From Swiss-Prot:
E.C. number: 2.7.4.3
Task performed by this protein: Catalyzes the reversible transfer of the terminal phosphate group between ATP and AMP. Plays an important role in cellular energy homeostasis and in adenine nucleotide metabolism.
Protein name from the UniProt record: Adenylate kinase
Any one GO molecular-function label of the UniProt entry: ATP binding
One term under GO cellular component: cytoplasm
Pfam families: ADK
UniProt keyword terms in alphabetical order: ATP-binding, Cytoplasm, Kinase, Nucleotide biosynthesis, Nucleotide-binding, Transferase
Annotated pathway: Purine metabolism; AMP biosynthesis via salvage pathway; AMP from ADP: step 1/1
Enzyme class: transferase
Entry remark concerning the domains of this protein: Consists of three domains, a large central CORE domain and two small peripheral domains, NMPbind and LID, which undergo movements during catalysis. The LID domain closes over the site of phosphoryl transfer upon ATP binding. Assembling and dissambling the active center during each catalytic cycle provides an effective means to prevent ATP hydrolysis.
NCBIfam families: PRK00279.1-3, PRK14527.1, PRK14531.1
Length: 181
């Protein structure tokens, strides 16, 4: 299965992806992990991305897309993947669709983890990270809403909405049921 994971910060995407990866036998591909790996290994894409990050700029879509393309070409992703952190915009969704269509492997679905803002704030504050305060969290949620609302419309019938409140186990059971697993 080739799946994209969507959901606001604090929705539990990373937690669910780790469980789903094991249960479905497909890799969890996080763009954050890709950036860290490419920068850490000093790959040409990592060097290029680091220049933007060091300058306090967003890494351009084409650089991120090339990292994703390279990772999707690896053997363990041949039978499917869970993609987390890309796409974030309709432009990126179109780029991903082109990459997958050229490989003859279109996307199977888009899991959209839905959770209330208050639950997200509570979860993120309980993590105890220094940069997690309520104002910062609500700002991040606003950015997510602005970027992702068009993406959810764009994907239309590929969207699989999952209610992401409750225990990790309950959310995972709902996800697997929605995927027919």
């Amino acid at each position: 299965m080739r799946l994209v994971l969507l959901g606001p910060p604090g929705a539990g995407k990373g937690t669910q992806a780790a469980i789903l990866s094991e249960k479905l036998g497909i890799p969890h591909i996080s763009t954050g992990d890709l950036f860290r790996a490419n920068i850490g290994e000093g790959t040409p894409l990592g060097i290029e991305a680091k220049q933007y990050i060091d300058a306090g700029k967003l890494v351009p879509t084409d650089v991120t897309a090339r990292m994703v393309q390279s990772r999707l070409a690896e053997a363990d992703a041949a039978e499917g993947f869970l993609l987390d952190g890309f796409p974030r915009t309709v432009e990126q969704a179109d780029i991903l669709a082109d990459l997958l269509d050229k490989a003859g492997n279109p996307l199977d679905g888009v899991i959209n983890y839905q959770v209330s803002e208050d639950v997200v704030v509570e979860r993120m504050l309980s993590r105890g990270r220094a940069d997690d305060n309520e104002e910062t969290i609500r700002t991040r949620l606003g950015v997510y809403r602005d970027e992702t609302a068009p993406l959810i419309s764009h994907y239309g019938d590929k969207i699989i909405n999952i209610e992401a409140e409750g225990s990790v186990e309950d959310i995972n059971a709902r996800t697997l049921e929605a995927l027919g697993k």
